[in-house]
Amino acid sequence: MQYFKNIVFLLVLFNSFQAFSESIYNITPIEVSKNVYVFFGDVNNLNNVNGGAISNTGFIIGKKSILVIDAGPSYLYASRVIEIIKSYSSLPIKHLIVTHHHPDHSFGISKFIEIGANVIMSQAEINMYFKYGNRLLRQVKKSIGDNWFIKTKIVKFGNNEEFPLNLDLGGRKVSIELYSQGHSEGDLVIEDLLSKIIFVGDLVFTERAPTIPHANITNWNKYISDIKNRKWDYIIPGHGELIKIQEQLLLTKYWINYIDKTAKQAVLNGTSPAEIFNEGIPASLRKYKLAKETWIRDLPLLINKYESE
């Protein structure tokens, strides 16, 4: 009997340790320019290994303060990011810029509020965060496990900022612009003027297929063209690797235009998503990571959207 008790104890201990270890974010920032760093997210879907850390988080160190771009998927993630930033600089984290409300970018907000950071987010996306945040939090907990979301909560905060907005971190100026009704209802784009690095959030994806749950494809397409024509050395997308050349922006453009055209044609012809899926994923889209999952999930959303217009 004691043997079985010991076995049960060891199993419980192992499972507890496993749950704890799975909740540690093994992340390391990459310095993409002097005092500009990026935690590049996993390019897979959120799962119980990556803990939802699938988007890119950045931070910029000035002479007086630090600015962080995107809070990440959870309180634990944000805590780890802050811990790492403090190992690079003792300066205060004064600003958190949240590019939009999607969980992988915003669910770490409460931790930054705890340390006194000023949260900057478009009003349209604050509204979405408040409206859908708790529902989305329940969904991601169910999807990958509660252990990743310890202390994660949707918190109230105000926003009195108007865009474009200019911030001075001390010898380092940052501009923030609002791109309304693009990938989301209010995407923020952040440029570090010293390094000519632009953080564009989910207006641009590399390596993987772009997602379109709240997108206005027409505007989004225009915004990518606008970003492409700006003067920059590097672009940090919301997902995927560093962008060094303009051609990398075309991957997002091609996908969103293709899925948009397919959805509109389906509505015009009365074609159902199932009929399109029976033909398989188009060959030109197969090079995108997560292409099949994204195509199957997002095409019906667009078709339903255009049918209701």
Where are these regions (language model features)?
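Conserved beta-strand hairpin/beta-sheet module of binuclear metal-dependent hydrolase folds
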Residues: 33-84, 188-200
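Active-site HxH/HxHxD metal-binding segment of metal-dependent hydrolases
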Residues: 83-166, 261
